[in-house]
Amino acid sequence: MAEILLSEAEKAFIHHGVQDDLRCDGRTRLDYRPIILETGLVSNASGSSRLRLANSDVLVGVKVELASPLPEKPLEGRLEFFVDCSANATPEFEGRGGEDLANEICRFLQMSYMSGDTINLAELSVLAGQQCWVLYVDILILECGGNLYDTVSLAVKSALYTTQIPSIKVATMDGDQPELELSEDPYDTKRLNTQNVPCLVTLMKIGNHYLVDPTPEEECCSSSGVVVAVSGTKKITAVRKIGSGSLHPESLVSMLKTASEVGAVVNKILMKTLLEEERAGKTQKVGFMR
Amino acid sequence: MPVDSRRLQGPESAFSYTLLEKKDANAEESILSADMQKMLIDSKQIRKDKRKPTDARPLFLRTGIISQAKGSAYIEQGNTKLVCGVYGPREVQKKSDFRLNGQLFCEFKFAPFSCQKRRSHQQDNEELVLSGLLREALEAAVCLHHFPKAQVEVNVMVIENDGSPLAAALTCASLALSSASIPMYDLVVGASVRQLPKVLLLDPTKDEEWQPELSHDQNNSNLTVGYMPSMQQVCAYVHEGVSNTEDLEQMLKLVTEYCLKVQPIVQLCLKETVEKMLANEGENKDAE
């Protein structure tokens, strides 16, 4: 969100375009921009992905570590999110400028992952009450080109899909101290079931219509919108209204309905792509050269 | 509040003694929605605090509670108590923030003793996000163009949290803003609702609120809405939990109807505030 200055004429142009279902770049109101996704880029991370949605670039790294579980939830592992809006993304993020946005994205991700049975945290338990896996999901925002929520959620889902968690066996010794044995085979890993992991869909309201995947210019024209977390089963796990405007209850309800439809489609296509990439095997990584 | 922003405090080793409570076997299994529902509402559709599912808790509002502030309000919604103070319009503190429209700065804070689990005296992530939500909601209601290059500060302090703090904060803040003579389009009324698989509970208490730790079921969620009744606009919408769009529609309808009923109460409080202010002014003039 670099300083976008739009004249009144430009704003009117965008408004008229949205009315006619033809946006500035030729998309319809419910079209996404082209997405480039690659996983397994970072060798030191247990899972990683890089997702580029037109001009928005996000790199996610997942590291798994052993820790003691939360005292309130002794039978579950944890997911810890951290979003870093680097100053590279846009000059507004210099210093502590990006902290608010980073915090909001982080908190919303946490909320949408904690709801329902999006991810089975019981799978991450190693030794009840003593040891569990903690997945540290670190999100780096490399470039900001509008629609950060969607980009981040798709990247996180891809990274979690490819995360390899090493197998650990608990060997009970004669004394009370159980010992943890790491499997000798480095490829003996398990993966999480990310079928139900939610994708975030941002809908911004311009005039009487709403758009999916807004560009920074369109975000500037709009005063309000909603971010909806849609799980794999077309259920809504978290919603937040963003922007300083207000919405009529009827438009809000229709936006939620559209978001759940769009979210279901996005989820399906993402899973299909990830499966295809997995099947293609360890071909040459494109990485950051593109 | 002394705030140390240079050091990062390590995690505290102290934990709440309630974790040592002996949980009976029934409680362990009642993560399932059916039992959860039995815990909160009995067969005659009466909740734990003798309310019906669509009954809200009694509301108490008062303004002028902070004498030094431009405007202030105190709200009690059942056991949830919070105070809001409004300062401004005054000059923008940070030199870089120079805008043609006025700015709103909101701070939402839980007092450390307000919740069951002790809160830190510095704002944590949850409070920062709630501050942002409050700000976005109030920005929709306040006429920002009436005080260019100036800022208005809204500080909310939750004294006791017994469910729906954001909803109470929205109502309290808009009452405080209007009693501070900040021009607004409409009053914001906040309300929340808890969705259980077969019933909707309006204005949930802390025990009735959806907890991300407990419920792993479908159709269990919490919705907080900030609504401007006269303009029929939703200015804040936060939903957490798993729901269908049809259920969300029903929940929104229930909440907006409740907000319409609460609006006259808030307006009455404001009217009494204005009458008191005019009476005071009249007395001062007589004294002179």
Regions from the PLM with identified roles:
Chain B
Residues 1-288:
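Polyanion-binding surfaces on beta-sheet-dominated domains and ring/shell assemblies
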